[in-house]
Amino acid sequence: MKKLVKVRGITLGEGRPKICVPLVGKNLAQLKEEAAYFQTLDADIAEWRADFYEDVDDVDQVCAALAEIRGLLKDTPLIFTFRSAAEGGEKEISTARYFSLNEAVVKTGLADVIDIELFNDEEQVKALVETAHGHEVSVIISNHDFEKTPAAEEIVSRLRKAQELGADLPKIAVMPETTADVLRLLEATCTMNEKYADRPIITMSMAGKGIISRLAGEVFGSAMTFGAAKKASAPGQIAAGELKEILHILHRNL
């Protein structure tokens, strides 16, 4: 029996994939506008992509902005993510700053979930997972390959590693060059979900070619999908409203 992940009334790992919409404002005014606009969307979860935020180097400013976002989102689940440039993010910070930023966010109690990148020092990842869980914050451990789609075995291996490190939600996003690459991601998702996962997983194939993977999570085993509000944070994201409509059609017929 797989465990479910429950965040503020949203349950990941049962029913249709839950829709997450990123907030990508560069400053507090833009973020507040996006958070207010989010309330008009038919989405389940918000993700603050703090790597877009111009004051991300100032932890106090980050925590203050987080408090503003939390207030506007009310009871919506909120993921805090600093995506490194190496994995498709807007900027790079040192490893030490990356971990201290995430730890500071965890200790505010304002984010429900943090996203930690898999390819970091294992002991530091484990320590941050432990700190997060101690503050009742769930953890995504993620990997993003914007260059290619690895072999199915490698995709499964990375997801299993994230699970072993304590992720509540192991995640991988890969870039397809061919249609066969998309099939490989779906095959790996199915294999992980049926053979190895004891918790919900999140997978996607990016760009236009991979769009089917954002829609078919309930069939193949991905518990969350990402939709766009006004500006996409990754290639291939479609509008949240359209996404929910398609997911409901699929859910009714499965």
Swiss-Prot record:
MF term (GO), any: 3-dehydroquinate dehydratase activity
Pfam families (UniProt xref): DHquinase_I
Amino acids binding 3-dehydroquinate: 47-49, 83, 214, 233, 237
PROSITE patterns xref list: DEHYDROQUINASE_I
Gene3D superfamilies: Aldolase class I (3.20.20.70)
Gene name, Swiss-Prot/TrEMBL: aroD
Domain of life: Bacteria
Protein function: Involved in the third step of the chorismate pathway, which leads to the biosynthesis of aromatic amino acids. Catalyzes the cis-dehydration of 3-dehydroquinate (DHQ) and introduces the first double bond of the aromatic ring to yield 3-dehydroshikimate.
Keyword Cytoplasm: no
UniProt record similarity statement: Belongs to the type-I 3-dehydroquinase family.
Keywords (A to Z) from UniProt: Amino-acid biosynthesis, Aromatic amino acid biosynthesis, Lyase, Schiff base
Record organism: Bacillus licheniformis (strain ATCC 14580 / DSM 13 / JCM 2505 / CCUG 7422 / NBRC 12200 / NCIMB 9375 / NCTC 10341 / NRRL NRS-1264 / Gibson 46)
Reaction(s) the record says it catalyses: 3-dehydroquinate = 3-dehydroshikimate + H2O
Name this polypeptide is given: 3-dehydroquinate dehydratase
SUPFAM superfamilies: Aldolase (SSF51569)
SS bond list: none
Species classification: Bacteria, Bacillati, Bacillota, Bacilli, Bacillales
Pathway info: Metabolic intermediate biosynthesis; chorismate biosynthesis; chorismate from D-erythrose 4-phosphate and phosphoenolpyruvate: step 3/7
The enzyme's E.C. designation: 4.2.1.10
